Amino acid sequence: TLGAEQKQWLLDGLYDSRSTWRLIGNPYNANPLKIEDLDTPELRAMNPNLRHNEGIYVSNEGWDDYQVERKEILDFLVEHDIRNVVFSSGHTHVFFASELQPDFDDPASPVAAFDFVTGSLTADPPAEDIAPLEVLRIAQQLLLAQNAPYLKDVNLIDQGYALLDCTPEETIVTFRVIDTFDIDAQPRTYAQFRVARDSRHIERMV
């Protein structure tokens, strides 16, 4: 949670920075994780008093618990045309790649920033001890479907880490996975993304 003083410090830093890339280290995912969208034109026609962005969200201590503050930050970035903002997030123990919009239910809402969330290396048991792999694969597809088009990738199964490489012209994020229960296992790249300087979109490279 950001208090008023902390939030203003963050906004001032983003506004005053002359760096090409503005990186925000973040303990939890900034992207929404909606299980069911309840703010649809059909539902709103039946209930005009429906709250904006109404839905059932995954409760994981992420920014979905602080939607007003998230929107304020993203609106600020759009209002002042502050680009090249990348949230680098962890602690969720899964991989996500997302484009962040002030209003995720409005297709015309501009992309204000990007969120890349890394999996964990040592914090979790084998995925199949949590749920059958087929169930996890279905969950991945459901999350992608419910959070399209801004959620670009989700991996609930593999353990691993992320590499973030910034140059003056682009940021490359590489998701690496490894079987941490196999002593002979080697890491492999399962996904790689590019954000070009001043771009509003993520490009998938792998």
What are these model-predicted stretches?
Residues 1-206:
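Long, structured stretches of catalytic cores involved in phosphate-ester chemistry, encompassing
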